[in-house]
Amino acid sequence: MIKYPMTVQGARALEEELTHLTKVIRPKLSQDIGTARELGDLKENAEYHAAREQQGMVEARIRDIEGRMQNAVVIDVTTIAHTGKVIFGTTVEIANVETDESVVYQIVGEDEADIKKGKISVGSPIARALIAKEEGDVVVVKTPSGVIEYEIIEVRHI
């Protein structure tokens, strides 16, 4: 079975979602199905069919989260000695060599990536170029819009 890296924050978010789905949503859907059943003929009961469909989606999401958690390797970057090298979970400030524009990214697991929040997937072109490099290094990133050079300004374990 393939294991996937996940940050502590990513694991916590999945656990919270799983708890919400199993403790709040699942019981409410069961209650909704019971209430809809009482309305009569199930063949033409839109409320019943909608609740059953939603129940199926919730159960699929629960299975998905449980599978992800089972195959996750949770990495707490704050427990790893700071060497100045970029590793999974670190937060990296980089500057475009040509424009001097800087940006900060945290390198996270595939499921945690959210570019709007500054979280990039470990499998993204930028992250792949940054991994194992050090502060002061210049990396070349091949993107759909062309080749960009970035200098690593700072690596933080937060």
Swiss-Prot record:
Pfam family for this entry, one: GreA_GreB_N
Database matches in SUPFAM superfamilies: FKBP-like, GreA transcript cleavage protein, N-terminal domain
Keyword DNA-binding belongs to the record: yes
InterPro entries, per the entry: GreA/GreB_C_sf (IPR036953), TF_GreA/GreB_CS (IPR018151), Tscrpt_elong_fac_GreA (IPR006359), Tscrpt_elong_fac_GreA/B (IPR028624), Tscrpt_elong_fac_GreA/B_C (IPR001437), Tscrpt_elong_fac_GreA/B_fam (IPR023459), Tscrpt_elong_fac_GreA/B_N (IPR022691), Tscrpt_elong_fac_GreA/B_N_sf (IPR036805)
Entry keyword set: DNA-binding, Transcription, Transcription regulation
Superkingdom in the source lineage: Bacteria
GO BP, sorted A to Z: DNA-templated transcription elongation; regulation of DNA-templated transcription elongation
Any one GO molecular function term: DNA binding
HAMAP family: GreA_GreB
Family according to the record: Belongs to the GreA/GreB family.
Summary of the function given for this chain in its UniProt record: Necessary for efficient RNA polymerase transcription elongation past template-encoded arresting sites. The arresting sites in DNA have the property of trapping a certain fraction of elongating RNA polymerases that pass through, resulting in locked ternary complexes. Cleavage of the nascent transcript by cleavage factors such as GreA or GreB allows the resumption of elongation from the new 3'terminus. GreA releases sequences of 2 to 3 nucleotides.
Protein name (database record): Transcription elongation factor GreA
Species: Pseudomonas syringae pv. tomato (strain ATCC BAA-871 / DC3000)
